[in-house]
Regions:
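Active-site-proximal beta-strand elements of phosphoester/diester hydrolases
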Residues: 221-224
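N-terminal beta1-alpha1 cap of cysteine-dependent amidohydrolase-like domains
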Residues: 1-113, 124-131, 135-174, 181, ...
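The feature captures the ABC ATPase H-loop/switch
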Residues: 119
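Conserved G/P- and acidic residue-centered "switch" motifs that form tight phosphate/ATP-binding loops
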Residues: 116
């Protein structure tokens, strides 16, 4: 095994504490652990506020990029949607930096793995649109996580619905199954797919659950479920991070 490990950037979310007196940029430990243990990478958190002129220099240091989930949805002005209600959480800084990083990564060949909000950002970055509230669409399931003071972490991340993989697509090369069960913790989802993207999986109610960017030379995959949850127990999630890690290592060798 090579002693060189890929440096993998992980997007962060803006968190406000102490009544607005303290703002931090953070990400869940599960993403960090999955990158370190299953992608065999060195995880580096990327704060939301980086100057445009510094993005290219940042990418010279990265061998991969993970786009994490987040409480805030992508603001609709980025895809021509109706404004959010005033109480909807937003993350202006993350929208700005991630939507610029995605096409830059594709152009350079930096591997990208988008999770939950990440798949939505990949779609918006290339001109696609999003549903604001999937559960309000006729014949669609409620994809949001269960809520309540007594809801456990296990219940939040339980396998909720089936997804079907696109025939002869990315997942046919990754695992030996045509379908799989996944967790579901999102209210927003892909509406119109960007022209540059390819659908890799649907949920059983027709919601797009996985995509790829075919023009990327190695790995540019987004999934709507939370693949960072217990990859040590879930073969699909484990395989995704391992394949992403291989692509990141290959990127080092091609620099």
């Amino acid at each position: 095994m090579s002693s060189i490990k890929p440096i993998i950037g992980i997007s962060t979310n803006e968190i406000t504490n102490f009544g607005g007196r303290q703002i931090s940029h953070s990400t869940g430990l599960r993403y960090v652990n999955a990158v370190a243990k299953f992608a065999n990478g060195i995880p580096i958190l990327i704060p939301s506020y980086i100057k445009d002129e510094d993005l290219d220099q940042l990418l010279k240091k990265l061998d991969g990029l993970v786009l994490t989930g987040g409480r805030a949805n992508v603001e609709p002005h980025h895809f021509g949607g109706d404004p959010f209600p005033p109480d909807e959480p937003i993350d202006v800084g993350r929208d700005e930096i991630v939507l610029k990083l995605i096409p830059k990564c594709v152009n350079l060949g930096v591997p990208i793995f988008g999770i939950c909000r990440g798949i939505q950002e990949m779609n918006v970055a290339y001109g696609g649109t999003l549903h604001y509230r999937v559960h309000l669409i006729p014949d669609k399931n409620d994809h949001r996580m269960p809520r309540g003071d007594d809801v456990t972490v296990k219940e939040i991340f339980t396998l909720r619905h089936r997804i079907d993989f696109t025939k002869n697509g990315f997942f046919s090369r990754l695992i030996n199954n045509d379908s799989c069960m996944v967790n579901s913790l999102h209210g927003q989802a892909i509406d119109s797919l960007a022209q540059n993207l390819k659908i890799e999986a649907y949920s059983d109610d027709g919601v797009i659950e996985a995509i790829s960017i075919p023009e990327h030379p190695s790995f540019a995959v987004g999934v709507q479920w939370h693949a960072e949850y217990e990859p040590e127990k879930n073969e699909l999630n484990k395989s995704l991070f391992m394949e992403f890690g291989k692509a990141c290592l290959n990127y080092i060798n091609k620099k």
